[in-house]
A protein has these predicted regions:
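Low-complexity, Gly/Ser/Thr/Pro-rich intrinsically disordered linker/tail segments
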Residues: 162, 167-176, 184-187, 191-194, ...
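Generic preference for well-ordered secondary structure
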Residues: 6, 10, 44, 155, ...
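Detector for Asparagine
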Residues: 77, 86, 92-93, 98, ...
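Generic detector of short, locally flexible boundary/turn motifs and exposed helical patches
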Residues: 25-26, 60, 155-158, 166-167, ...
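Bimodal feature
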Residues: 48-55, 77, 207, 215, ...
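A mid-sequence, solvent-exposed acidic-amphipathic segment
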Residues: 127-179
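Short, basic, low-complexity termini and linkers enriched in Ser/Thr/Gly/Pro
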Residues: 153-156, 194-218, 257
């Protein structure tokens, strides 16, 4: 998108809650090719904006920056805060000077308190797993707990433990301890998008048929689906479908208020 198009959409959705804005911006990236650069194209090029490709980290960064900024320029300034453990610095040529100080681990993002408030414990019984990189233990919602939700009569999308998910919530997917390569706890990140769909059903009332409208809330995950050596793209999928087939052992969740 051009700066003009970005500014127009920022203005269009400015009155919506921040979570909705995050989800709407994430949705704008659906179909974007997966970033094949091992470091991330934005890191290699030392730029803030590299919207031609996206991995899960860049999608997370950009959706929040664009949602919180009122202009494209303000989004860049927000990026200097959100992407970095301390704060990003730009040179006179607009290039990033200190990408080595960026968030490289999803667990560092959620534990920084700058990537929303952690709400993991609101979705069911938490399980403790072995941590790494200075964390003795980490509390997660296990995949087993999530699948138990999906086996309920209303399914994962409508189950009580996930009915609290809101637009723009961040889901951090947790790797099995034995699959960690460089001490990483989080293996993937996605953004929640909810939609309400109306369904009509026929009911009988006083021997007369009438149409009754029922709203069904669907929960989607927007995420950069791919591998650095195989490609892919940003997808929007049912959260229940992703949970059923995901290679991760659980999740943590954060929310911007």
């Amino acid at each position: 998108m051009s700066d003009t198009e970005i500014a127009s959409f920022q203005k269009e959705i400015a009155g919506k809650p921040v979570g909705e804005r995050i989800a709407l911006w994430a949705e704008k990236f659906v179909g974007t090719p997966y970033d094949p650069d091992p470091l991330g194209e934005y890191v290699t090029r030392k730029v803030i904006v590299a919207d031609e490709h996206a991995d899960c980290m860049y999608l997370s960064f950009r959706a929040v920056e664009l949602a919180m900024g009122l202009t494209p320029e303000e989004a860049v300034n927000i990026a200097l805060d959100k992407r970095f453990i301390n704060r990003g610095k730009l040179g006179n040529n607009g290039k990033v000077l200190n990408y080595e100080d960026r968030f490289q681990y999803g667990e560092d993002m959620i534990d920084s308190d700058r990537w929303g408030r952690e709400i993991t414990g609101e979705f069911g019984k938490v399980t403790e797993i072995t941590g790494s990189r200075g964390r003795e233990k980490v509390k997660i919602i296990s995949k087993k707990t999530m699948l138990n939700c999906s086996n309920g009569s209303s399914g994962l999308n409508g189950s009580s433990c996930f009915s609290k998910l809101r637009d723009g919530d961040f889901i951090f997917f947790i790797k099995a301890v034995e699959k960690r390569k460089v001490g990483e706890i989080v293996g993937h990140i996605g953004i929640v998008k909810t939609e309400v769909r109306s369904q009509k059903s026929e009911v009988r009332d006083n021997e007369e048929q009438r149409a009754e409208s029922k709203d069904q809330r669907e929960i989607y995950l927007i995420h950069a689906s791919g591998l650095k050596n195989k490609g892919g793209k940003v997808k929007k999928v049912r959260l229940s479908d992703y949970i059923n087939s995901m290679p991760f052992i659980g999740i943590r969740v954060s929310r911007f208020n």
